[in-house]
């Protein structure tokens, strides 16, 4: 009886492994490539080294023009910020955010590319930062 269960388990495992990998391939980052062509940013935030937001109000995201306008508090250290993106399902971001990012060069705004789940659609977003004037 144990022999039958082991054989059945082995057969089920082989079937599961061989059929599971055929539907959606995996990209170079280990993420599934899907059929989704949607490609947009749904939310954006900047946090300081204390992981608290530095933005004033909501970020204005224009998914047609591919721009993000955000106002940060006066005195914010623009050289040490963590950008936080919320993307549509299955999309990914380039370059990858690996830690603190320098946003201090306001004349040359940072750009990030959102890539759809299908990897067929790419949109490059420009982040414009305005520093709130001191009161």
Predicted regions and their residues:
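Bacterial N-terminal signal peptides that target proteins for export
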Residues: 1-8
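Alpha-helical transmembrane segments
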Residues: 11-15
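Beta-rich interaction/scaffold domains
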Residues: 21-135
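C-terminal motif of bacterial Sec signal peptides marking the signal peptidase cleavage site
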Residues: 16-20
